Swiss-Prot record:
UniProt GO BP: cytoplasmic translation; ribosomal large subunit assembly
Organism phylogeny: Archaea, Methanobacteriati, Methanobacteriota, Stenosarchaea group, Methanomicrobia
Protein name: Large ribosomal subunit protein uL10
Organism from which the protein derives: Methanosarcina barkeri (strain Fusaro / DSM 804)
Keyword Ribosomal protein: yes
Cellular-component GO terms for this entry: cytosolic large ribosomal subunit
UniProt keyword list: Ribonucleoprotein, Ribosomal protein, RNA-binding, rRNA-binding
GO terms assigned for molecular function: large ribosomal subunit rRNA binding; structural constituent of ribosome
A Pfam family hit: RL10P_insert
């Protein structure tokens, strides 16, 4: 106990304040994450901090002090210590882990690579002209392994070439030429390692989602849930309107088929009875013209006229279509004729 007290007394005050500050930031935000800042210039970090000010707080501290702060907070928070490696910063926000990931990805920008650095991916120089006039630059490009020549008064890359494969060391000559060609192989920004949210730890792989696909999946799931609820007659605020409309249509159909005399179906019953009546009367009149009276004969005549008018409608449309086609053919013929005259007279 004495040894622990003695050790605590020798911790500098600024370290205690730093640990307290980290703990307060974690406790005052819903979410915090660890990001790698290795290779990022101080000026770039300052710019990122300004860009994030409306969404998140970025704090750079010593790994040892961050570790102490996490350990003192307890619960599952100390599990974040395994993501402390090399140069690390903390980021605090009240947004969701997914929003934080998206915002941090937007901080990444292409950056030149230095000589002696490892290529993160294949570095490719594309075929095509450059902005350089003929001069010493031609030999410099060639000595760096870039196939260059003179074309139309400009230095040009003769063919597309992989000048450095992923994992290989980039030479100083090549690094210089890549920068001159404005080829920036590095993507520099805050590299999210993990996010802590209410006891759960999310790694980048879980947060990198395709938003359009995600939205499509949710929409499809919502539609399937709606259909299931309607087909199982499960009432909710979203389905009650459809369920009532479906129930009304089914009850009306039942009333008509069962011939239930109700104010809600009387119009449909009368219309159905009228159709049945004219059908029977028509068959009777076909067998014996005197089987129907004058009034019923007028009804049958009106029905026959209406049916004939409906049957003629498609014929009229067909005639109009044929006339339009003939007019188009005439127009084309005139155009062809004019074109022919044009060719004759140059």
């Amino acid at each position: 106990m004495e040894e622990e007290k003695h050790h605590t007394e020798h911790v500098p005050e600024w370290k205690k304040d730093e640990i307290e500050n980290i703990m307060e930031l974690i406790q005052s935000h819903k979410v915090f994450g660890m990001v790698g800042i290795e290779g990022i210039l101080a000026t770039k970090i300052q710019k990122i901090r300004r860009d994030l000010k409306d969404v998140a707080v970025l704090k750079v501290s010593r790994n040892s002090l961050t570790e102490r702060a996490l350990n003192q907070l307890g619960e599952s928070i100390p599990e974040m210590n395994k993501y402390l490696d090399k140069q690390t910063a903390l980021v605090f926000t009240n947004e969701s882990p997914f929003k934080l990931y998206k915002v941090l990805e937007q901080t990444k920008t292409p950056s030149p690579i230095k000589g002696g650095a490892i290529a993160p991916a294949d570095i490719i120089v594309q075929k095509g002209p450059t902005s350089f006039p003929p001069g010493p630059i031609l030999g410099e490009l060639q000595s760096a392994g870039i196939p260059a020549s003179i074309d139309a008064g400009k230095v040009a890359v003769k063919e597309t070439k992989v000048v450095c494969k992923a994992g290989e060391v980039v030479s100083q000559k090549l690094a210089t030429m890549l920068t001159k060609l404005e080829i920036y192989p590095l993507i520099v920004g805050l590299d999210l390692r993990a996010v802590y949210d209410n006891g759960a730890i999310y790694e980048p792989e879980l947060l990198a989602i395709d938003e359009s696909q995600y939205f499509s999946d949710i929409t499809r799931a919502a539609q399937s849930a709606f259909n299931l609820a309607v087909n199982t007659a499960y009432p909710t605020s979203a389905t009650i309107g459809t369920l009532l409309a479906k129930a009304f249509a089914e009850s009306k159909n039942l009333g008509v088929n069962a011939v239930v005399f109700d104010s809600g179906v009387m119009d449909a019953l009368l219309a159905k009875a009228h159709v049945q009546m004219t059908s029977v009367a028509s068959e009777a009149a076909d067998k014996d013209a005197n089987a129907v009276d004058d009034q019923l004969r007028e009804v049958l005549g009106a029905a026959a006229s209406a049916a004939a008018a409906v049957a003629k409608e498609p014929e009229k449309k067909e005639e109009v279509k044929e006339e339009e086609e003939e007019e188009e053919e005439e127009d084309h013929s005139e155009e062809d004729g004019m074109a022919g005259l044009g060719s004759l007279f140059g």
